Amino acid sequence: MKKIIAIALTALVALSASAEKADVGKRAVIDYTTLLVDEVAQVTIVTGNIIVTKGTLMLRAEKAVIKTSPEEDMQITLTTIPGKMASFRQKRDGGPDPWVEGEAQRIEYDERTAVVKLVGNAHIRQLEGSTMTDQIKSEFISYDSMREVFAARNDASGASKPGQGRGQLIIAPRKARTAPAPAAPATPPAPTDAS
């Protein structure tokens, strides 16, 4: 069992996707319908079709609770109404048009560490343009865009628990393969002289 887990974790590391490094220094822009700011507690609550943009990072949900650390880094928790999903999308460095996107019942984003956690019915996809290259489905997925690491667990707590279900990893072919050339037709045997 430990060997299977080690192989799965190795596969997840191989699926690494680096977020666009320029996003780190960008300002955050938050669109909302309703806003409540508590300066003493350093908490902001926004509701109503929330869109958070920070460089190429885009987070969407129905509600966001934004806490500011003493170092002035944001921790954002996005939730939504039943039947809907919170989502994120971010451009990655490298390649012609690489992206990573995902959705879950709850999304947590830590500005200091650039980690996105997807909790509850989580899905994450890597794309080249609009073509999916890889996908992970699990109850909990953590995406560390600075270290280029994905981690998935079968329980929304972020732990792997026996009997809690299974995740799924889909890996697309890395390059197009050409069909092998057709085999040459078999040469009929030469006629034999039976006389």
Segments predicted by a language model, with ranges:
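Mature-chain termini and adjacent capping regions
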Residues: 1-195
